[in-house]
Regions:
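Short, polar/charged alpha-helical segment
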Residues: 45-56, 60-62, 66-86, 163, ...
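Extracytoplasmic ligand-binding site segments that recognize negatively charged/polar headgroups
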Residues: 62-76, 88-243
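Short amphipathic alpha-helical coupling segments at ligand-binding clamshell hinges
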Residues: 75, 212, 216-219, 286-298, ...
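A ligand-binding cleft/hinge motif common to bilobed small-molecule-binding domains
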Residues: 121-124, 244-263
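Periplasmic-binding protein-like
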Residues: 141-144, 158-160, 187-196, 217-221, 225-228, 298-319, ...
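A bilobed periplasmic-binding-protein/Venus flytrap-type ligand-binding module shared by bacterial periplasmic
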Residues: 162-169, 205-207, 275-290, 306
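Extracellular/periplasmic bilobal clamshell ligand-binding domains
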Residues: 321-362
Length: 362
């Protein structure tokens, strides 16, 4: 999902009564908790054997994801081949994943076993009591940033915000080494930013110190950057030379273009932030053994290698990736959700409201 644009819609869903309706299903949740938790929290020596035997009896696993099919299908196909467990995969945008899950729960239908989506959507599901904690031996291979305090989901991939530049238009000695370098006169009207990146904005401001951070972004707004919708689009515009440099792209998207011969490179500027994607097991999963087995697979070296093969950034420390070899911090989905209105309003005032884009200088 681009830029968490449905945060206010998610709040509206709650106001319309979905939370109340979910709460009214407390008996179903309590029953599910005692049934599923035994599977989710088991750590005995025969754990893998018990999961596999239970999953084969269950016969399938149902997954709701926002990860696009060209990236998610190879993972589910590998899981089916390894374990012989049928996967039912439903893919949609992150907003629709949340809406469908909440709507089904309101009606007393609990279809998904596993959710895999951007961190903010998974955090919303956690707050709606849709998820449950689980244990896994692969956790030791993951960074501390992969676990929220409530531990009801686990980060399995990152989208790292970096700059990107066209190598035909930007000389090596012109490539910025800091965010301050983007304020140089040569970049007037030439810097691209994605329209929905208020979560990145808020994270960078807080890292700089709110007073200093807001002062910096006011200066950046004065350079009249070119605002576009879609990180993939911005990367493609940089590669095509329509925008010489962009401040908020995903480095894995740039890497794909580079491998295809496009004149584009990325660079991480400190502080570098990653927008997390996460995997979670459903509190009311109809196939709990298969749910944990798939979550294990997604977070294992095998699953993380498959994420890497799709030019995405795996969270595992056990999988080497050229896309995370720099100091980074994770954008906290809980903070984004709690503070979204503040940062969305500031972002809109600075970069979206009544702004005229400058024509790039020659």
């Amino acid at each position: 999902m681009e830029g968490f644009r449905f945060l206010f819609q998610a709040r509206n869903l709650c106001k319309l009564g979905l939370v109340f309706m979910l709460a009214s299903s407390g008996a179903a949740f309590a029953q599910a908790k005692s049934k599923q938790s035994e599977v989710y929290m088991y750590e005995g020596a025969d754990r893998e054997q018990r999961l596999l035997e239970g999953a084969r009896k269950e016969g399938m696993v149902s997954i709701y994801t926002s990860l696009n099919l060209k990236d998610s299908a190879p993972i589910t196909e590998a899981f089916e081949k390894k374990y012989g467990i049928k996967v039912s995969l439903w893919r949609a945008g992150g907003e629709k994943v949340v809406q469908r899950a909440l709507t089904e729960a309101r009606a007393g239908r609990f279809t998904p076993d596993v959710f895999e989506s951007d961190g903010i959507e998974i955090e919303i599901l956690a707050r709606e009591k849709m998820l449950a904690e689980f244990k896994s031996p692969v956790f030791k291979e993951l960074p501390a940033e992969a676990f929220p305090p409530h531990r009801q989901y686990v980060v399995d991939r990152f989208n790292f915000f970096t700059i990107a530049y066209n190598t035909n238009l930007v000389k090596p000695d012109e490539v910025p080494n800091s965010y301050e370098d983007l304020l140089q006169p040569r970049w007037l009207g030439k810097v691209g930013i994605e329209a929905g990146d208020s979560d990145w904005f808020g994270s960078v401001v807080k890292a700089m110190g709110e007073k200093e951070g807001l002062a910096y972004f006011r200066k950046l707004a004065d350079t009249r950057p070119q605002v576009r919708t879609g990180h993939t689009l911005i990367s493609e515009l940089v590669a095509a030379g329509e925008i010489p440099i962009a401040a908020t792209v995903y480095n894995h998207a740039v890497e794909r273009l580079t491998k295809n011969g496009a004149p584009i490179k990325w660079k991480a500027l400190p502080p570098t932030f990653g927008r997390p994607g996460a995997v979670a097991v459903a509190r009311n999963a109809p196939h709990p053994h298969a749910a944990v087995l798939f979550a294990d697979f997604m977070l294992s070296r095998e699953g993380q290698e498959l994420i890497k093969q799709r030019n995405r950034v795996p969270s595992s420390k056990a999988v080497d990736s050229p896309l995370n070899k720099f100091p980074y911090r994770m954008i906290d989905p809980a903070i984004v959700l709690d503070e979204s209105e503040k940062w969305e309003n500031l972002w809109t005032d600075l970069f979206l409201k009544g702004k005229k884009q400058a024509k790039p200088s020659e």
